[in-house]
Amino acid sequence: GVIRGERTDGAMLAHAVDASESSQPRQGVRGLVIATFAFVTVFAASAVPIPLYSEYKGAIGLTDADISATMLMYLFGVVLTLFLSGSLSDAAGRRPLAAASLLLAMLGCFLFLRAADPTIVLVARAVQGVSCGLAMSAVSALVVDSAVGRYEGFGLAVAGCGALLGVMAGSLAVGFLSLVTQQHALI
């Protein structure tokens, strides 16, 4: 810390002030907010198709075996990416991989939106797996790197729980929207 002296009643008070905790730079807080939003958003996007699988069953003939295969494709994408992205994050930087993670999340959602057969659903889920693998490694590290000083605990909490929050938010949002649009169609 930095020692700063103040005069009070003729006595010199010296106390330590940690410069990183005294005031978080505006840029740092903004970076933390953006990284947190990106992290939670990627996992929210990965949860979007889950409540819609029953809709896909009727619309494109998705079977229970296909749904099981989507889980395997997702896990394969996550695991493969986790093996490769740690060193890639160190070499290329966290921000480019965070951007790639968000772009892949959007691509996965677009593929689900346009899915005309079960194969597209499987590919979309694999893309989401890669997106989440990048988020687990590079984006969570970006969150922690951005969380300095008094925000360090928040950054660690986001890195530890942000994925669960995103999955919950994405599932609830799509489930709610599906319910509302079905009720609206009935009216």
Label each residue range with its predicted role.
Residues L97-F110:
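Structural signature of the two symmetry-related core transmembrane helices
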